[in-house]
A protein has these predicted regions:
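Cleavable N-terminal export/targeting peptides
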Residues: 1-26
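Gram-negative outer-membrane beta-barrel domains
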Residues: 20-226
């Protein structure tokens, strides 16, 4: 994925001197409606067998800021940009009651397991090749690399508690439409899917928890060309 983005970035730089009517630098803000799907698994003794599974979805809205640079040819253009979410996004806390069977020396116990998380420092580097369908309107595709930090917290009667930060990387693909006004103001609307790498947490008593996250978003952006 990183090699693909590097290839597009190199192409972008090679085209820069050759295109005389480059659209230029832009700043903007984005509001997006998101659905984050999380598939969680738990391996109590890290032996490769899955002891528990849970799939959940969280719907949320989030704001972000972006900076980008666009080069335009006659009909084709390419944009390179960076989007930053300056806020933390919480994954809703989930709880479930669990009973632990006792042995000949211990009595059975019942308790509540819970898991929650926070996504922070989220940023996306993206490439958007596009095609003009009018004098001021472009259809474009998005290819991006996303990175963030996830703080995972878990409490369980079968393992020691978790409170740990892990790195989260993902690949973003999408499509959108952009309209630029004569004043330099522009609006963008796009749909995107981000598939994140699987992350894992291991407790001190060898319980391994893994989570696979996928995000779907509908976004509306407002920006200004300079």
């Amino acid at each position: 994925m990183k090699k693909i983005i590097l290839l597009f970035s190199t192409l972008f730089l090679m085209l820069s001197p050759a295109i005389s009517n480059a659209a230029g630098f832009a700043l903007g803000v984005t509001v997006s409606d998101n659905t984050l799907d999380t598939a969680g698994k738990e391996d109590v003794d890290s032996n490769g067998s899955i002891d528990a599974k849970k799939n959940v979805s969280d719907d949320f809205n989030v704001g972000s800021i972006f900076a980008e640079f666009t080069n335009m040819g006659d009909r084709f253009g390419i944009t390179v940009g960076l989007e930053i979410i300056p806020f933390d996004a919480d994954i809703d806390k989930r709880s479930i009651t669990q009973s632990e069977l006792g042995d000949e020396n211990d009595t059975a116990s019942t308790g509540t397991n819970s898991v929650e998380g926070t996504v922070k420092d989220h940023m996306t580097f993206y490439i958007q090749p596009g095609y003009m369908v009018g004098s001021n309107t472009m259809l474009y595709g998005t290819l991006g690399f996303a990175s963030a930090t996830v703080n995972g917290k878990s409490k369980s009667i079968t393992h020691t508690n978790i409170n740990k930060d892990v790195d989260l990387d993902g690949t973003k693909v999408g499509v959108g439409i952009k309209h630029v006004y004569d004043s330099g103001l522009f609006i963008k609307a796009d749909y995107a899917e981000t598939s994140y790498d699987t992350i894992s947490f291991t407790t001190s008593n060898s319980t391994k928890a893994t989570a696979d996250l996928d995000n779907t978003s509908l976004a509306l952006s407002l920006g200004k060309q300079f």
